[in-house]
Amino acid sequence: TNAQKALFSGITDVAVVNDTTVKVSLDKPNGSFLFNMAWGDAVIVAPESIEGIKNKPVGTGAFTFQNWVQGDRIELSRNPDYWGNRPALEKATFKFISDPTAAFAAVMAQDVDVFTGFPAPENLPQFEADPRFQVLEGSTEGETILSTNNKMPPLDNVKVRKAIAHAIDRQAIIDGAMFGYGTPIGTHFAPHNPDYVDLTSNSNYDPELSKKLLAEAGLSGGFKTTLKLPPPSYARRGGEIIASQLRAVGIETEISNLEWAQWLEQVFRGKDYGLTIVSHTEPMDIGIYARPDYYFQYDNPEFQSLMTELNGTTDPAKRSSMLKKAQRIISNDYVNGYLFELAFTTVANAKVRGLWKNAPTQATDLTGVSWAD
């Protein structure tokens, strides 16, 4: 099942016009349609390939699937029938390396040629000083947030969520967990987007205000909650820093370090958590706040109505105004603790050309990648 099938629910018909053109009909105007069609979830697949697509995907891209060793690697080879420009690479292997120490060792030994989203930012200066490597620093679409269960007492009280927001020192988290890599955010929107509103002052670091808000909420003695952390270093390192900052205003957190499967089961699907830290890397995903059954369980009819109106609006100026209003609503409701936009750091062999500096979508595009002569 396509995880983003709701994005395409408005399609009523797809008609073949000629060998290279199709006509897509919608049940109503959709201002996000073209953007949605650029998602990886909108790729074309042959119906007869569906049964085995989980283990042997078939597509129309520049490379074809060759082999998958679960937990270790995926092997691709150049597609001789690719419709676009012929890629320079004949083959490519994607390795799975999640541990920061192992990542550093693999790159330093040149066992891998490119490591996108490098998980150990503290090692980047060492690579920058080594002529064998190049370091690219860009941006992702990843809003890194202190996700909050809006239905769990006392987190269902906006004063408590506001107290948490003012107890957090974003820059200390960026410096301590990400070694300075990351851009502070005050809402769920990418700072490089033209429609971004800087709302960081709405939740500035103010522990005394945090204590005052807790007292107003009847929690002058503080309270305890859970902080369940997925594997990425931004979460594990950031979690320790945030726990210390919350403790300073009287909020105690019980930290649990989870593997991704556990996090998906307990937090994302089970909603059995108080706080968690995660980067939402899907582009332009502020619409998730209009889904009351989403894992942070935010239910605001005004916001839901705004998103419905946005989806049916195609005028760019009107859409911009709506997106800015949406950012302000969730910032003022302190739905989550908005931390930073995740940086996109890549370490690569100095001879590799054509790599993406930024990560505008969840893809690693190899069509333009080549080796220098």
Residue ranges: model-predicted function:
Residues 70, 182, 194, 211, ...:
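Ligand/substrate-recognition segments at binding pockets and active sites
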Residues 19-20, 27-31, 68-70, 79-81, ...:
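Solvent-exposed coil/turn segments that connect beta secondary-structure elements
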Residues 38-67, 81-88, 125-138, 147-158, ...:
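Short, solvent-exposed loop/beta-turn-alpha elements that line the ligand-binding surface or hinge
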Residues 3-45:
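Surface-exposed binding/hinge segments that line
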Residues 77-80, 129, 155-244, 248, ...:
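Append "and occasionally in soluble cytosolic enzymes with long acidic Gly/Pro-rich linkers
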Residues 22-24, 61-64, 74-75, 90-95, ...:
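Short, well-ordered beta-strand elements
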Residues 51, 79-125, 243, 252-254:
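Ligand-site clamp/hinge motif
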Residues 2, 7, 100-106, 119-130, ...:
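Pocket-flanking alpha-helical
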